[in-house]
Amino acid sequence: MEWKTEVKFLGVMFDSRLTWAAHTDYIKERCQKRINLMRSLSGTSWGANKQTLLTIYKALIRSVLDYGCTAYNTASENVKAKLDKIQAQALRIICGAMKCTSIAALQVECGEMPLKLRRESLQNKYGIKIKTTADHPTANILKQNIKISKKKTSFAKETQKFLNKIPPTAGPVVGKTPPWHHKTIQPIFELHNQINKNSSPTVVRQTVLALFAKYNGFVKIYTDGSKNAEGVVGAAFCIATLGIQRSFRLSDSISVYTAEMIAIQQALLFILHHKIKQAIIVTDSLSVLQSIQSGFSHTRPNLLEELKCIITEISEQDGNLIFIWVPAHCGIIGNEAADKLAKGALSNKQIDKIVPFELKEAYALVDEGIGAAWQREWTNNKKGRALFRMKSRK
């Protein structure tokens, strides 16, 4: 067999020293032809517009730059700088800018983050995906790499740094009961078209009381979730007639949607454990009730599965359970009390309930962190200040 210092495997060029120089040259050669195509499609008074060229860049060039970046991201900065030049050429064509134009300004104008940050984003997201996928073949390899690697940086070490900053991430959904055994729920959205924030307190009170009068003898449980600007999250439920109030501070940075689901989950567990036969869950979260009704949640399938199981258990104990939607901040006493409790939980010094991140929420946290890093770079950059005065936010 012929000895080679470079080999191509699954579209990635590996060299004997893993410098990735051969792969970046390969990427540059592929992208240069596509940049020439973009040039032929652009012009000052004719040709494709900015949005069309940006779409072409994302499809034909950025996709090539992204492929395999979790592997070649360990290359030296000098090697990866070749790829930055490719992005710069493409953005100049898209904006019709001259060579002297600030690259940072072009990136902001086109909404394309620096490649360094994009690679970091894709790397962290792939690390999260590995961690949350059961029996992923790469997981054990990465664990071994962290222990034996002598390099200052590696894919395993960099992703682990990020994973250490966030709570545990939920794995795949495993149903406890067959879906055909789940109790079907039809929430009541009657108030959706009857009252809103512009309705007078008197109208709101009369409309809500008229609806609740249909369910005389039911225990009404109000639930709510809250999140502040710092990412602190709380959830609560209350039963005014029984004088019961429960509030919890949840894991930071999870969504309000998740907080609302946790509040309902805790209320359902209270109903189950205290064997309440007739109960109404009152919430202002339309999205959570729609998820319960449809049986599908894009961001929280695990938690929704838990809710369905608890609802089924309550039904099997001959419990009569009703879900009612009410508008937020319309003077409904129980709803306002739950909202106050949820906001009060934000001041708790310790987290009462650790909530594992779902994949989409963890991805959103990556995007938030990378977006903040890009904003800092743009704010502190000494170039492109003319655009910065008009567009200080990236």
Identify the function of each model-found stretch:
Residues L18, S40-K58, S63, N73-K394:
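RNase H-like, metal-dependent ribonuclease domains
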Residues E2-T70:
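Basic, alpha-helical interaction scaffolds
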